[in-house]
A protein has these predicted regions:
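Basic, helix-initiating cap at the start of DNA-binding domains
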Residues: 1-22, 26
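Short amphipathic alpha-helical segment with a characteristic S/N-K-E followed by hydrophobic residues
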Residues: 26, 49-54
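N-terminal intrinsically disordered/low-complexity leader segments
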Residues: 1-4, 172-176
């Protein structure tokens, strides 16, 4: 493993540990580098800010599950999203605790936006941001709620619930 990757992993691991008991805005780069046993120069050779570290952590977690494989929508995507939240729930719960989940949601939107360029559906490509807000935003919020409430349902049950939500159509009362 090259030195840069090793440093990034050490910084990431240390930041997650610190976030377990301290909000991001109270963590300093000096404190992080001391706890990670690296120099500040090594930190700045790899990152500019603590937010960059969070982005790196999330990006790696995301790549491990999704592997840039979505050119169309499928139930597999929903299963992978649930798996991602299940596998990374410790990290995501820490982010929720310190109100940083919106930072990750924004980054998630950027990732999904890059996927939509490859979707076969022209309408989705033309209205990508609205689509992401409607579809992926809903999945992200459902999965966030699931882990924040202690994963009371199994991942299979959550998947079945989402499939049922997918079937529901908006019905307006015609009796008016």
């Amino acid at each position: 493993m090259n030195k840069s990757i090793k440093t990034k992993k050490q910084v990431s691991k240390t930041l997650i540990k610190l976030l377990n008991y301290k909000p991001l805005d109270l963590i300093t780069i000096k404190e992080l580098t001391e706890k990670a046993n690296i120099s500040r120069t090594a930190f700045y050779n790899n990152f500019h800010t603590l937010e960059d570290v969070l982005k790196y952590i999330y990006q790696n977690a995301h790549k491990q599950v999704f592997k840039d494989k979505y050119s169309h929508l499928s139930y597999e995507h929903i299963k992978d999203m649930i798996h991602f939240f299940d596998k990374n729930s410790k990290l995501l719960l820490v982010l929720i605790k310190w109100n940083l989940i919106e930072f990750i949601a924004k980054y998630n939107t950027e990732i999904v936006l890059s996927y939509t360029q490859h979707y076969k559906n022209k309408f989705i490509r033309e209205h990508a941001f609205y689509f992401i807000s409607y579809y992926h935003g809903s999945l992200f919020n459902i999965c966030t709620y699931w882990i924040a409430s202690g994963k009371q349902e199994s991942s299979d049950t959550l998947f079945k619930m989402i499939k049922e939500f997918e079937k529901i159509k908006f019905v307006y009362n015609q009796k008016g």
